């Protein structure tokens, strides 16, 4: 499939580094555009791959996409836009103007350049946080009202609104609202709830859990990559202008459920439950993933127990030497 060329913004990141690997494995040409804010070690193994090209750039730059293309390669037919200030804490840390610049204005910039280059598919990484809370207790669908509870969700909704206004353009948007991710990556994050809980249980032998009964939807990072690849390989007219929740109906868990998976492998962990009276991340939501299963035939292959097991293995074996380093946490590292 060397006639297919995919450009990934944020390709050195948590999702992008695995996606790059899988696209190369599937014989795509891959251009990674990344500012390397969190380093570039995750893509070092690809540097000598004949179908890989890297360009260091900031997605807010007006020529970032155009100048990243290798001259003797065909222009990208698909652009996957992952680069962003990701997460509620990180957006709060940088403030509204910076979050808006990198999450909204950059999306418009990257889409515009992608269209000028002739790309016919634009994949956008969004979030199920856009729904806010499940007030009636029913799983939210892609048609449910949006009720953002954070600056991060506000920026993603604004980007979605722009992209959906471009659904009839030659560069057709495809939007994925990811569930909460977990699992190990070449650029692992320990500010994701499952990974974070495993790390705390491993290093402290204890956990403090707030709002134990609050529900969220979870998905393994490798399943997210599979879902994105199914989206770029689907018939264009099937996915043009479409929004898909990306996860599984079997992935809706409370925080107590996550703790139970951890206790299965670390039964010595002491758990203390507390309630938040204000502040913090108060999401309580259940999500439906019926649409992506029906339209794309997607379902997950990994579960929470798989994620707990692999994170624990990485910690026990020392594969990740200093998991407390702030580089594994978006907000803390950005503040530095």
Label every model-predicted segment.
Residues 1-170:
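N-terminal Rossmann-like NAD(P)+-binding domain of SDR-like oxidoreductases, especially those catalyzing
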Residues 205, 209-336:
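C-terminal substrate-binding subdomain of Rossmann-fold SDR/epimerase-dehydratase oxidoreductases
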Residues 136, 149, 161-216, 221-232, ...:
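NAD(P)-dependent short-chain dehydrogenase/reductase
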Residues 8-9, 81, 121-124, 174-180, ...:
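Structural signature of the Rossmann-like NAD(P)-dependent dehydrogenase/reductase core
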Residues 60, 130, 181-183, 224, ...:
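Conserved sequence/active-site signature of Rossmann-fold short-chain dehydrogenase/reductase
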Residues 29, 51-53, 172-174, 208, ...:
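Conserved beta-strand segments of alpha/beta enzyme cores
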Residues 12, 58, 144, 182, ...:
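Structured beta->alpha junctions
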């Amino acid at each position: 499939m060397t006639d297919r060329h995919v450009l990934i913004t944020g390709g050195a990141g948590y999702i992008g580094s695995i996606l790059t690997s899988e696209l190369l494995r599937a014989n795509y040409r891959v251009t990674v555009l990344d500012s390397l804010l969190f380093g570039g070690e995750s893509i070092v193994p690809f540097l000598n791959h004949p179908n890989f090209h890297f360009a260091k750039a900031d997605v807010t730059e007006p020529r970032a996409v155009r100048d990243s293309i290798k001259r003797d390669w065909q222009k990208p037919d698909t652009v996957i836009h992952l680069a962003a200030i990701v997460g509620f804490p990180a957006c709060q840390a940088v403030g509204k103007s910076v979050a808006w610049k990198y999450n909204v204005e950059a999306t418009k910039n990257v889409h515009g350049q992608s269209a000028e280059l002739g790309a016919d598919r634009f994949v956008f990484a969004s979030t199920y946080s856009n729904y806010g809370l499940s007030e009636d207790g029913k799983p939210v669908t892609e048609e449910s009202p949006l009720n953002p509870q954070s600056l991060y969700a506000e920026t993603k909704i604004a980007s979605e609104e722009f992209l959906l206004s471009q659904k009839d353009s030659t560069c057709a948007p495809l939007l994925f609202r990811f569930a909460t991710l977990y699992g190990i990556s070449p650029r692992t994050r320990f500010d994701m709830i499952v990974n974070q809980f495993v790390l705390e249980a491993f290093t402290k032998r204890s956990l403090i859990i707030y709002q134990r009964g609050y529900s969220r939807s979870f998905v393994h990072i490798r399943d997210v990559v599979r879902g994105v690849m199914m989206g770029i390989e689907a018939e264009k007219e099937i996915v043009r202008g479409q929004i898909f929740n990306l996860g599984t109906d079997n992935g809706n868990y409370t925080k107590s459920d996550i703790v139970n998976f951890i206790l299965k492998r670390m039964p010595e962990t002491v758990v203390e439950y507390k309630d938040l009276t204000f502040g913090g991340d108060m999401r309580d939501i259940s999500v439906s993933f019926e649409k992506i299963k029906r339209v794309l035939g997607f379902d997950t292959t990994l579960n929470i127990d798989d994620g707990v097991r692999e994170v624990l293995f990485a910690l026990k074996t020392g594969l990740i030497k200093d998991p407390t380093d702030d580089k594994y946490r978006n907000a803390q590292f950005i503040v530095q």
